[in-house]
């Protein structure tokens, strides 16, 4: 299996009142194509900072991030924006849809950024919306007329409309109840099973069980890694192995 991301001595430092805070410390890691990679860790450990560095949303202070063989740390702001548009999909805890546009048009607008064939993009948008259980009856509604879980699934459809090499998800179920959160996780899992590479930050063990590879961040470093790929999804041994691993990490 090929690596879609490789980092070398990745560091991120912030200045806080004149004091240098080292949030990421010499991180070397690989993200494999087709994996559902989970990033876990305590609050403030550097999980989201790592996600943003991997995706090019935030430049590291030092080190390399090679995305599909290209070192994105050497790109300027405009180059990074185009690279993210063409290669990345993003799903955040708070989904931002355009309230003045219909559900379908929110997804369509993202697709038209890279493909000007409106008819083809419209058909693809409808297919993806249907695949995340956003039914035809909702396509003409506005974001204010749908539930939080439905809005998050629209966000997933929007993230996938341009067939990204990698989807980055930052606490996508954090603002949802367990039922609607499960629907969102089901949607992400469905696309991963079809071959979509995903990296997701979460603090929730139920969400983490969806991944086949767990990276645990502690004090800005990768403290440990757990491979769940050998276990069947939903199997108690999978859950037990994850709990044991998190216990070893002091979670």
Predicted segments with their positions:
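Conserved ABC ATPase "signature" region
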Residues: 70-71, 108, 119-137
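Helix-to-loop junction immediately C-terminal to a conserved catalytic motif
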Residues: 55
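Short coil-to-helix segment of the ABC ATPase nucleotide-binding domain corresponding to the Q-loop/switch region
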Residues: 101-110
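Catalytic Walker B motif of ABC-type/P-loop ATPase nucleotide-binding domains
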Residues: 167-170
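Conserved ABC ATPase signature
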Residues: 142-146, 150-152
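Conserved beta-strand-loop-alpha-helix hinge in the C-terminal portion
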Residues: 221-246
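Conserved catalytic motifs of ABC-family nucleotide-binding domains
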Residues: 163
């Amino acid at each position: 299996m090929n690596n879609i991301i490789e980092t070398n001595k990745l560091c991120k430092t912030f200045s806080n009142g004149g004091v240098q805070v080292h949030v990421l410390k010499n991180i070397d890691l690989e993200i494999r194509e087709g994996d559902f990679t989970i990033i876990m860790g305590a609050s403030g450990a550097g999980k989201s900072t790592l996600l943003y560095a991997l995706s090019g949303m935030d430049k590291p202070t030092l080190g390399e991030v090679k995305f599909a063989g290209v070192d994105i740390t050497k790109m300027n702001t405009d180059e990074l924006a185009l690279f993210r548009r063409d290669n990345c999909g993003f799903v955040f805890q708070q989904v931002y849809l355009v309230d003045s546009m219909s559900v379908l048009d929110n997804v369509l607008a993202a697709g038209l950024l890279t493909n000007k064939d409106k008819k083809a993009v419209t058909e693809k948008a409808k297919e993806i919306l249907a695949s995340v259980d956003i039914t035809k009856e909702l396509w003409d509604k506005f974001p204010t007329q749908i539930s939080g879980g439905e809005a998050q699934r629209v966000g997933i459809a929007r993230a996938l409309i341009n067939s990204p090499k990698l989807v980055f998800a930052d606490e996508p179920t954090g603002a949802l109840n367990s039922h609607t959160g499960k629907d969102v996780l089901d949607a992400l899992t469905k696309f991963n099973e079809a071959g979509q590479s995903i990296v997701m930050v979460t603090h929730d063990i139920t969400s983490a069980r969806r991944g086949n590879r767990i990276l645990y961040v502690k004090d800005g470093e990768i403290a440990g890694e757990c491979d769940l790929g050998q276990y069947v999804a939903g199997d108690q041994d999978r859950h037990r192995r994850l709990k044991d691993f998190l216990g070893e990490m002091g979670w």
